[in-house]
Regions:
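Canonical Rossmann dinucleotide-binding motif of NAD(H)/NADP(H)-dependent dehydrogenases/reductases
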Residues: 18-50, 188
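Substrate-binding pocket helix/loop in short-chain dehydrogenase/reductase
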Residues: 115-116, 120-128, 248
Length: 291
């Protein structure tokens, strides 16, 4: 009996074709950073991945790299704030997946910081629309591919932040948006879990090395739908105060920031069979920060 049990466990942990073999995934904001790393990891585990990003050139580059490495990827660039694009994204993904979609990772987004008394309506509305409304609309558009009973796994991951859990000075808009997606996650889990077996989870990141945590002086920016440029990153003086000297990263028990690959690995774990009984939860990927 013991040997049979060992063989059974080994079979569950051995995925010769990859943990996501046969699955089709949409990953928004996957032209760079955490999203791109998530796409690469998913493809390495056998998934067909759709690269969704507002930057068409970056989306295509990631897709080309995955395909050149033997994976399967399709770039479908567009603006998450455009309802027509969301419909097209779902349509093209279903075609790419032979009528099926198994995974959505709502990762697209950026920060547009400002203290409460100086935050404009435009700053507020844009961040809420991008981080809350757009993920909801994408999930709603993809509902016919998740509300099915075919015995295949379905997963939705909403990306959040410790700003959404603990708040953060200068980020009232972002904090509210990232707190909001956890409510969306739990509602999906409760509505679509019982009948269709859909798992929904939130992954909340701490300090991860991306363009959002680089020095603002490096010049990274995004452009809003009406053409306004929004500078990304942290002012160099503020960044140096936290990261230099003997007190560097003292609020992180592991003593360092995380990499995009480490962040993406957490997303892979959540959608994998290894987390098959986990739903409606928030996984904090912070190096121990905010314990």
């Amino acid at each position: 009996m013991a040997s049979k049990r060992v063989a059974q466990i080994a079979a569950h942990l051995n995925f010769p074709k990859g943990m996501l073999s046969g699955q089709v995934a949409i990953i928004t904001g996957s032209g760079q950073g955490i999203g791109a790393e998530t796409a690469r990891l998913f493809a390495n585990e056998g998934a067909k991945v759709v690269i969704s990003d507002i930057d068409a050139a970056k989306a295509q580059k990631v897709a080309d790299e995955i395909n050149a490495a033997g994976g399967q990827a399709l770039a479908v660039p567009g603006d998450m704030l455009d309802d027509a694009y969301l419909g097209e994204l779902v349509k093209k993904t279903a075609e790419f997946g032979n009528g099926k979609i198994h995974i959505i990772v709502n990762n697209a987004g950026y920060t547009w910081d400002g203290v409460i008394h100086k935050t404009t309506d435009k700053q507020w509305d844009t961040i809420i629309a991008l981080h809350c409304t757009a993920p909801f609309k994408l999930v709603r558009a993809a509902a016919p591919y998740f509300r099915v009973k075919d015995g295949e796994p379905r997963n939705i991951v909403n990306i959040s932040s410790t700003s959404g859990i603990h708040g953060n000075a200068g980020q009232a808009n972002y904090a509210l948006a990232k707190a909001g997606v956890t409510g969306l996650t739990k509602t999906i889990a409760k509505e679509w879990g019982p009948t269709f077996g859909v798992r929904a989870n939130t992954v909340a990141f701490g300090f991860i090395l991306t363009r959002l945590t680089a020095a603002k002086e490096e010049g990274a920016f995004v452009t809003t739908p009406d053409g306004e440029k929004v500078a990304l990153g942290i002012p160099q003086a503020q960044k140096a105060a936290r990261e230099d000297g003997s007190a560097a990263f003292k609020d992180i028990p592991l003593g360092r920031p995380g990499t995009a690959t480490e962040a993406a690995s957490a997303v892979l774990a959540v959608v994998s069979p290894l987390f098959s009984y986990v739903s409606g939860q928030t996984l904090s990927v912070t190096g121990g920060r905010n314990m």
